Amino acid sequence: MSINVTENHSKTFLIITLIFLLSLSVTGFGKSPEDKGYEIAARSDRSDNGYGDSKVEMTMILRNAAGDETTRSISFTTLERENEEVGDKSLVLFNTPQDIKGTALLSHAQILKPDNQWLYLPALKRVKRISSSNKSGPFVGSEFAFEDFTATELKKFSYKFLREEPCGELTCDVLERIPLYEKSGYSKQVSWIDQSIFQLRKLEFYDRRGQLLKVLEASDYREYLDGIWRSHRFAMKNVQTKKQTDLVWEDYQFKTGLTDNAFEKGKLSRIR
């Protein structure tokens, strides 16, 4: 009986090729959308590691549906926690206008537990703890919610890669992320992360009914500390009310020596 060696080799090659292609469906280029989404989000999150602490002055510009503007000046400080299982700390302090001068929001970000947030109201001379059920509400009349002013910790969300597409002159990875922490005001968020410096360019917020609520656009990125990038303008548009809030940052200062002592609840009433 004759044996067709060439035919057998062809069949063997075909089988090996099929096995290789099947392996790609679960590893390498064939990563699941969830694994790929988490990998991209982690790369973006970790690209900013190592800044230590930061101080920056910023301007908040509120626009109503008619286009009328109100401006507020704010000091914003943050303290980085190197352990990904421990959230960062931040402090927002209003300097103007006079009627809200001294108002301060202290945030201790958590991972899956509700963030710890306290609001100091100088007119009442008291510190108010923000309950987890109120964190989806607007922060001092802006289009940013209380939960938007805490650190976006990597493990607060589950992720799914959706697609790759142009975003301006760049190319972005588009990810869906779903809050894993309790009582979020959002059912999901969709983020655009650029492939050049791995920074957020756009973020869509969907309300609890699954309807698009707000769109955040981040621009004017500048580099600090050899690889630490910061946006100098956020534009948050509420597509349901047509209102908008912009945040405009001045130059950042990093590694200024801040410690946990600067982010204690008991010191809120003495902050100036």
Task: Name what the model sees in each region.
Residues 42, 106-108, 116-120, 126-130, ...:
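Gly/Pro-enriched, hydrophobic low-complexity segments
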Residues 271-272:
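Short, solvent-exposed mixed-charge patches
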Residues 2-16:
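Bacterial N-terminal signal peptides that target proteins for export
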